[in-house]
Amino acid sequence: MDTIININNNNQKYPQSAEEYHKVLCNYFITLQSAMQSTSRPSSSSPPSLPAVSSELLSSSFPTNAPESSSRDLAPKQNQFTINVVLFDEKKKKNPEENLPANGDQLATLRSLMMQINPSSPPSIPATSPQLPLAESENVPESSSTLKDHKFSLNTMLFNVKKNDAVKISLANQEQWAKFHEIGTEMMVFNSGRRLFPLLAYKVSGLDPHKLYCAGVHMIPDSAYKQEYDHDLQQWVNCLNQKKTIFKPTSEILGRIENGFKLMSLGIDMSDVKIFNIAIRKKTPLQIEKSRKPNLDKTIEVLIQYKYLPVIKIYELSNSGMEKKEIAQATFPETSFVTVSIYRNQKIKEMKTLGNKYCRTDRKQIVMEQRGELEQ
């Protein structure tokens, strides 16, 4: 059957123009149709009959200014339309019209003809020719996901931080923080700075033992409203008669640079983090800096009677240590606290005095004596 259909085996003269090539192609499909009808095959494997080629397709003419093609240029095109290539070559079946002239009615007629050759998987043919301009109605809408949520958009490449899911952070002293959180944690704030208690201590896993890392802590507001202590409820509540506060980003306190093995075995100790507040702004900047003592890089400025939440971040450092990349961050609700200038809840004051190793011994004795008197 190939010898009947293949143009190369019929000793025909190669077409000398695009118009002649088009007519030869149409005659080829007519010959293909008659050959497939005359060949007897089982009903399960026999392909559907081809429709008759429209007279419009045969009589259609190409533009007069169409460039003429030599027989050498058209020879490889003829080989692409043998029966084996059309029916069994998967690459050509995907888009058999790739090398055909895209000319209006001709392309539409050929498309319908090819879809009936293999109706189960019709070839994907572009609806418009590449040479034609895109119509206004075919413009991609702005809400299209291909434009809005593109994987390689500029915002994704610049601002999306890729987190390492293998890195896990947990609170080392979670039970202690939970006891304070049940009552309502308060943190005393001075101009010179004061350590947090309970201390910030974390456990981490999933790091590369040989790479260098460092941890950082900063504060975020846990409520936009100023807090007031309700003595009847014995807890802090939002002061709703005031406007919401716009917070400035707090500074970040960085820990020591360690390798992954040491951080995973010893944990992350951020006990040197302090918070401070400047109550009197009439002081000069030099007086303010002197009142805060030397460790300026370990203090975070906060507002009084506001609720804050510590944020822990882990950075992976380059070999030179000059560049860092954030790989994980975490917050824990039980570590939220209210900044105060004086303790309002006496239970919090007692727990801090007895549990804080930095508290003076005489203060601890006073609290223990008061507790003993209350028990008696």
UniProtKB/Swiss-Prot annotation:
Matching Pfam families: T-box (PF00907)
GO biological process, one term: sex determination
GO molecular function terms listed in the Swiss-Prot or TrEMBL record: DNA-binding transcription factor activity, RNA polymerase II-specific; RNA polymerase II cis-regulatory region sequence-specific DNA binding; RNA polymerase II transcription regulatory region sequence-specific DNA binding
Annotation: DNA-binding region: 171-364
InterPro entries recorded: p53-like_TF_DNA-bd_sf, T-box_DNA-bd, T-box_sf, TF_T-box, TF_T-box_CS
PROSITE patterns: TBOX_1, TBOX_3
Family matches, as SUPFAM superfamilies: p53-like transcription factors
Gene Ontology CC terms, in alphabetical order: chromatin; nucleus
CDD domains tied to this protein: T-box
Keywords per UniProt: Activator, DNA-binding, Nucleus, Transcription, Transcription regulation
Disordered as annotated region, ranges: 38-76
Top-level taxon of origin: Eukaryota
Keyword field contains Nucleus: yes
Physiological role: Transcriptional regulator involved in developmental processes. Directly binds to the promoter region of the sex-determining factor xol-1 to activate its transcription. Its activation of xol-1 transcription controls sex determination and X chromosome dosage compensation to promote male development. Has a role in the fox-1-sex-1-mediated determination of sexual fate.
Protein name, UniProt field: T-box transcription factor 18
Species annotation: Caenorhabditis elegans
